[in-house]
């Protein structure tokens, strides 16, 4: 039986690119979507073109714990799970003094609670299978440095980074490796861009002077799913074009 990778929010952007690269590596792919079903179907068509299976399910992490049960449906349809990529997320910006509690909770529900529940479902199945597995959390550079006027998002990404380390330490006895990938400014639909926006000198405030491509995140995820990463766990790997070396976002006014 082929190995199975489930990628949350794989209807576009980083999640879609992860699905396609893992399909090229021979994984059957579980695809989830929140609001773009057609995007998920497009991903599935491209996945199947690589000669592997694809299954689609809607995943609403704003409604927990019930929403996370969609992951169990995918595991049942695909027969197992070997890789989980927690790529779903919510984000809003507001000054700390103006942040509404409801908005705060919405971000934490999706970004932290959702990742916790999906990881728990996946890890329990991996333990049952007895063959180990990989869990990869897509965080952000703001797991490591604050995003101005985004206290909830910053705190949630820090929390997900901490969860990554805690899971890695506990699950290693089951040969389940857990890591985070922390993207910088990537050309994704969530950011109002696509890979055509990855141009030289398009963003001079980043040392590499451009936005990142979704492939540049997905290729690291794919490596973390490979035998080459058999000795890597509990890490947060930053892919940011040098942003963290020269964070330009703080404006002292």
Where are these regions (language model features)?
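Substrate-binding pocket helix/loop in short-chain dehydrogenase/reductase
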Residues: 95-96, 103-108, 202
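Active-site helix of classical SDR
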Residues: 119, 156, 164
